[in-house]
Amino acid sequence: VPTWVTNFTGTNAEFEAAIKTYVTNVVTHYKGKVASWDVVNEAFNEDGSLRSTIFSQKLGSNYITKIFQWARAADPNAKLFYNDYNLESNVNKAKAAIALINANPTLIDGIGLQMHISLASPSATVLNTIMDKVVATGKLVHFSELDILVNPTGSVSSYDYATAIAQKNKYKEVFTIYKAKVPATQRFGITIWGMRDVDSWLKTNGAGFPDFPLLFGDNYEYKIA
């Protein structure tokens, strides 16, 4: 969040006007050039409640709807997404996102599941169950930030063959479930969150252990996956 937002000192009405102007200007500027937007990102707590942020505090609990309305008005043809993490593994959080989408059927075109996952979680059973609920919205489905941790607890000392095979199988599982569960008309796609392991956000924001979450090694070496 930029400092002009976090350090805003005006009234709530002035804050709303500033955010509306920002959303309108950005989306209008790229109208016809940008096909889709993640309009609101990471708005829910793990229990499905709304996170307390400067947006909820100053714009009210319905701030998500407001921002989608402004984006929709600025570019009626763009695909508008709600995006969040742990939707693929946390049923309560997924239900909150789905309820948001169902309450705003003309404003929200799709749901982005970030998919920062590990070899162990989510299981295929859990992912299949949640995907059934997500697909039932009838909206576009995007696996928006996929990467797969292989060393979340520090037990893996190197990227050996067994680890590579396990990661390959997990990537295959994810793609297989996506294709099996999401009808062709609802498939927005799968985005891998980076190319090389060395450039992964998990190098600096993970659990502090070395990891190898992407499809290419540090020097662009092909992986089995």
Segments predicted by a language model, with ranges:
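First exposed extracellular module after export/assembly in secreted or surface-exposed proteins
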Residues: 2-8, 13-16, 20, 106-107, ...
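Active-site cleft segment of glycoside hydrolase catalytic domains centered on the general acid/base Glu
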Residues: 3-96, 121-129, 163, 202-218
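Active-site beta-loop-alpha junctions enriched in small/polar residues
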Residues: 39-42, 85-88, 113-118, 146-149, ...
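Glycoside hydrolase catalytic-domain groove-lining segments
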Residues: 57-80, 90-158, 172-188
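Substrate-binding cleft of secreted/luminal carbohydrate-active enzymes
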Residues: 142-144, 164-225
